[in-house]
């Protein structure tokens, strides 16, 4: 692109993103163009961007991409129309002023290479002058419409009757009306503002469970459509159960078109022109606008569902690690038995087994399950049991709660979201890690490790398989995949990784690295022993200067040669960090001590900035790194809810106060695990006394919340909860 083109695109982005300062947008785009990654810019270039976070930087990147595509499309459309010899200064100016792709396409429509339409055939037969005469509004003093039509009769052109002539003119007028950008724009906005999305039942018999019952006779305004309802209606339509359409007051649209197209409403041609306008709307404009608006609604609903999925995944990835604990992972099942795997504090597998505590196993196997389970708890000094939340989860929870009461050591258990564990256990990564394990045994290991470090384990799985969202299989899979990859990348880099223990799947999400370099780091570690300096990364094959610059700050080395390597301070700032220490009367050996915390806390920040030349944000980050080396931001989050006993549905009574873990957040509320068979549902109206726009404003996946039982339906296995304090 030329400099002029780049400036036009830049101006469009600035106009679109008025919440950012122009200088911020320019700096972000320059940093991205130089090959810097989003996490690196967010963490280490705060002065340049004004402390924009990853989401804001990505928004600028995406809007710039859209503006670039828009500019290129405008150039292409102008070129095509110019080649046709039909480009006027006004049309060119209109195209150049367009801020949306839809507007460009509306302006281009009349000049598109069309298939041979009925209107085109009518023009070939010479009927354009007659159509123009009709639209000009002849009065009663003129020839009658029929008399004028007779002038165009032509056997050779297959215009044998007046009806043939009128039909041809009708097609021409209908196409002219359809191709006029201003008409489409007005009707689109009118429908967007006043239209209703209507769903009716098409095949109730196929809806055996009545999933779509509320949509059998349902309507909502296009302008106020609720995203999750749009996705539900789309799904019902896709399965053939519902018929979905957009309804609007057509009479007002017909009146608008007649007024615009008819130069003389009292003309003798008025009935013919009105009929052509109505036909143009019904055949061309209406269906096209319905498609556009339904696509628009679906895209908005997709974006909302993807946002919810992304937020839920982020909160799941950032669950606080349970450090230094020996954990037994239990993958529950009935017929095939519960698979057990014990991992030590580093995640290394110590033992694995299978027990059969549930029917249909015979009495002998069920009786043997308890002693075998307790022996494993005692032999390996297990402190925590992680139970997968899939099939047989609640029965397994009851079994575990009974067993841990009978052992001498104190053991707790937690229910772990096992979504995607089966996907992981059958993957190449799992086979490589545990070649001699059965699929279910790998799942048990994954469940145990999820409790120890959710992030390190979940990065091994396609994020779409984690299953915390709504309608994730109905939305654009490309957009969902891109968003979730971004969420994973952001989470990994916000937390950072231990260079000497991180797996290749975890390392490949570090800024600047890819799958090949991640594997090379692991191979280098295996061949040369643990890293004791970040500088050693320069010896890793394929890890060049740019990859080193982008990634090194996100990788930590505990117990290395330089304690700064165990902080999130970038090596480029090591000299400045040492200056800060000297100003506080400290040295490297003092990092992380109480003395350092006090001295750095009392440091005059203004003088420190003047002495070091550091910006406010970078100085702040350096002081934080020197105060708490090896800090894990997840440590500030509440630990998982640990239990020793179990509840049944029958134990629940309205008004009962409980603590639970938020398992999923959707548009209409949140699902909370309260330790009974079925997760309870807190409706959006029961989340807070204040107005709640979206449940994610109040709760997040993994939150520990206090809830009260609202009502229980034991027949349907449903528990309604409230977070509104009870009197």
Locations of regions flagged by a protein language model:
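A glycine-rich phosphate-binding loop feature that marks nucleotide/adenosyl-phosphate handling sites
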Residues: 189-196, 330-334, 390-395, 416-423, ...
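Long, highly charged, low-complexity intrinsically disordered interaction regions
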Residues: 8-9, 68-86, 96, 432-530, ...
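Generic start-of-chain signal for non-secretory N-termini
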Residues: 1-26, 33
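Duplex nucleic acid-engaging cores and interfaces of nucleic-acid transaction enzymes
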Residues: 53-59, 66, 70-329, 333-436, ...
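Single-stranded RNA-binding regions, centering on S1/OB-family and related RNA-binding modules
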Residues: 560-561, 565-727
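Structured, non-catalytic alpha/beta "coupling" segments that mediate domain-domain communication
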Residues: 94, 107-108, 236-251, 260-285, ...
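Short, ordered loop/turn segments at secondary-structure junctions
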Residues: 44-46, 249, 332, 345-346, ...
